Amino acid sequence: MVKSKKKTITIVIVAIVIMIAIYFLINVFQPPSLDNPESIAWDGTGSRFLISNTGNGKILYTTDFNQYEVLINEGLSSPRGIKFRTDTLYVADNTVIQIIDVKEAKIVESIPIPGSKMLNDIECDKEGLLYCTDTGANKLFIVNPHTKEINSFISPLMTKPNGIVFDGPRRQMFIVCFKPASPILAFNIDTKTFSIFKETLYDNLDGIAIDDLGRIYYSSWGEKCIFMIPQEQNRTIIWQKDLKAPADIYYHLPTNEILVPLFEDNEIKRFKAD
């Protein structure tokens, strides 16, 4: 009886050790993969794409979207929007903007954002100021990464702000919101005022991008597609459809492509902007 109990205990211990070993092998040696990809940025210095993964808190990089490597493995909570500028990656991470030195592959500074709840997308202007939407707090934050000056802006026009992109020629930010029938908002960076650029009938807008011809693209979870506004800005067309949970889209000038992270399918689609 005693021998039987010892044998059973031994078997259980061996089984536990084997399970731990299998778990370790899977998690350590399994190639990195997308986990709720949210945003994409281009690292011009390293000639690679950077991708934020909200699911596991990692920043991955790739050159071809077939194989991925880890840039940042720890220190982030829920990285969403990312913006690359002069060897630095700015990350909207819940209530903090994380600053990453991409050459050293490490977080070098964190800027807590008072009054924030869910920082989402992030953009910068030509002067290097950061503009960060907060979907939870219904705010737009403007952050000077050098002086650490932070200002917040609200508007009755803006509910659950999500994607943001800089319209340089007109010195304004376009913002879309994760709500029913979200308009495209314009935020004038000189006067600090909001206005409606274009009304839409579409729900839960996530990302917005502008190509080199001035065409505007935005993604909708509700309609599961990417819409495009042509240069004339006189209509809106369905540009790509059957896309589940299209997140923060990105225009890549060197290849003239719109890159679309599919948040729930853990995939990135590439479409020529022809």
Where on the chain are the PLM-derived regions?
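N-terminal Sec-pathway targeting helices
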Residues: 1-16
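Beta-propeller domains
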Residues: 51-69
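Short loop/turn segments that connect beta-strands within beta-propeller blades
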Residues: 62-67, 101-106, 144-148, 188-192, ...
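Short coil/turn segments within WD40 beta-propeller repeats
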Residues: 56-57, 95-96, 137-138, 180-182, ...
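Hydrophobic alpha-helical segments and helix pairs
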Residues: 96-145
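WD40 beta-propeller blade core
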Residues: 60, 98-99, 141, 183-185, ...
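A short beta-strand motif characteristic of beta-propeller blades
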Residues: 25-32, 66-73, 106-112, 148-155, ...
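Beta-rich, blade/repeat-based domains predominating
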Residues: 32-46, 74-94, 114-130, 156-181, ...
